[in-house]
Swiss-Prot record:
InterPro entries documented for this protein: ADOMET_SYNTHASE_CS, S-AdoMet_synt_C, S-AdoMet_synt_central, S-AdoMet_synt_N, S-AdoMet_synthetase, S-AdoMet_synthetase_sfam
GO cellular component: cytoplasm
Principal location: cytoplasm
Gene Ontology molecular function terms on file: ATP binding; magnesium ion binding; methionine adenosyltransferase activity
Protein name: S-adenosylmethionine synthase
Pathway per the UniProt entry: Amino-acid biosynthesis; S-adenosyl-L-methionine biosynthesis; S-adenosyl-L-methionine from L-methionine: step 1/1
Gene transcribed to yield this protein: metK
Subunit structure: Homotetramer; dimer of dimers.
Keywords, sorted A to Z: ATP-binding, Cytoplasm, Magnesium, Metal-binding, Nucleotide-binding, One-carbon metabolism, Potassium, Transferase
HAMAP family: S_AdoMet_synth1 (MF_00086)
Pfam families: S-AdoMet_synt_C, S-AdoMet_synt_M, S-AdoMet_synt_N
Residues bound to L-methionine: 57, 100, 240, 271
Amino acid sequence: MSEYSLFTSESVSEGHPDKIADQISDAVLDAIIAQDKYARVACETLVKTGVAIIAGEVTTSAWVDLEELVRKVIIDIGYNSSDVGFDGATCAVMNIIGKQSVDIAQGVDRSKPEDQGAGDQGLMFGYASNETDVLMPAPICFSHRLVERQAEARKSGLLPWLRPDAKSQVTCRYENGRVVGIDAVVLSTQHNPEVSQKDLQEAVMELIVKHTLPAELLHKGTQYHINPTGNFIIGGPVGDCGLTGRKIIVDSYGGMARHGGGAFSGKDPSKVDRSAAYAGRYVAKNIVAAGLAERCEIQVSYAIGVAQPTSISINTFGTGKVSDDKIVQLVRECFDLRPYAITKMLDLLHPMYQETAAYGHFGRTPQQKTVGDDTFTTFTWERTDRAQALRDAAGL
């Protein structure tokens, strides 16, 4: 981080229209993969006033009542009345999902599972930094926590006049690669019309901002912008059209690391846009946890239908204890980054994805979860179980 003195990242709540779309797409994936682990799913969602549209390509033996599922996701988020502008119980739901192209299938499917080809060409990045306890950049961590707290305050009834749509933004000040302060906080939250701006700003400041952000990083010069435009009554899909895959920087590292451009939500693990990005995070986090570097960014790339990555590259930004070339060699020794091997390594064939679709895919805590008779661990790419093997291989 030494090249920046200030860095800003943003996040959005689960009620933001683009995040509604992401959560619907991943709910569809989860419902299908719960019945058919090897299904091929690519589900895109659009939400706008009074309508939710799901489209894409799915090949599966599962049967899911997709209309009911879409409605449940929308209602669970908090859009359950026309008073808030969008109602999952009464909105139109349109399903235009088709089957996966046979041309793609022939490039992915193999008689030997380990030879499974990548579902598309592309490049993916993973990143980790030791500036926070979860080895993530601080600005995106703090931004996620603000909107997560907003949802908690809304759903618990602590601030009952809050509505689902919200956005946050945090600017951190760095010195010698360490966060030394928060210079600016922006939080815009949708609300009921009866609450005054004064009451809203005071409550949000005390019960969301100060409750969430580390007090030692807030200072007399910190700027606070709470609903800076005034009223935010009209929000969600009424205020803006929502689409799957439009919050890829929110989903990843808040702009601190590069991004290959591929979105995550609605895609089964055969799509390397998702699985290889998760593997990239797993590799980078273990490198930092092992003490091989303070910061690490990995890029992997693939060709459609080919199992082995076409490239693996590492950048430790001058913080490495060994050379970047040596770390690439260690990665090749300790991690199998073929698509099938990633799926096996991270145990990805479970209905774990809707939870990833709000508040970031990275920096989360693995939890054991049971769906039906399937018990599994979520966020497996956040484990640091290969750090010691990397240290040993590096001779540290």
